[in-house]
Amino acid sequence: MKVIFLQDVKGKGKKGDVKEVPTGYAQNFLIKNGYAKEANKGSMSALAGQKKAQEKHEAEVLAQAKEMQAFLEDEKTVVEIKAKAGEDSRLFGSIPSKQIAEALNKQYNVKLDKRKIELANPIRSLGYTNVPVKLHHEVTAKIKVHVVAE
């Protein structure tokens, strides 16, 4: 019997998969517990429509990420952060990704999750630093962060 999986079932299939399984297993376990439904013409066309909508949504998200990348990598987009520093231009403390995200939100009204900012080590010196930001699994931008002394 052909079924469409509604959830991931370990060892059998993932959500959205169409597979042939034994009739008894399908009727007595998969369909009964809501893990799958029978694959007929109506359910197959509904699945195709859902996949098409999912692809369209993913394309929109990718387009938004590329638009955000263009804005963040613009020459004029420089995130300025003030911090206390010593005479040798080393900071007292450091600037973590959370502070960069807050400054980006204040200065450019861009809400960005601090976990998307891929800062290997917190910034500990004055000057310009290029910081990578993962906007999408295919799109990564670099923002300029300028640390100035208070």
UniProtKB/Swiss-Prot annotation:
Keyword vocabulary terms for this entry:
Ribonucleoprotein, Ribosomal protein, RNA-binding, rRNA-binding
Q: Among the record's GO biological process terms, what is one?
A: translation
Q: Which Gene3D superfamilies match?
A: Ribosomal protein L9, C-terminal domain, Ribosomal protein L9, N-terminal domain
Gene Ontology CC terms: ribonucleoprotein complex; ribosome
Q: Per UniProt, what is one GO molecular function of this protein? A: structural constituent of ribosome
* Entry-linked InterPro entries: Ribosomal_bL9 (IPR000244), Ribosomal_bL9/RNase_H1_N (IPR009027), Ribosomal_bL9_bac/chp (IPR020594), Ribosomal_bL9_C (IPR020069), Ribosomal_bL9_C_sf (IPR036791), Ribosomal_bL9_N (IPR020070), Ribosomal_bL9_N_sf (IPR036935)
- Keyword Ribosomal protein among UniProt keywords: yes
Cited NCBIfam families: L9
**Similarity comment: family membership:** Belongs to the bacterial ribosomal protein bL9 family.
**Role played:** Binds to the 23S rRNA.
In its UniProt entry, what is this protein called? Large ribosomal subunit protein bL9
Q: Which gene encodes it?
A: rplI
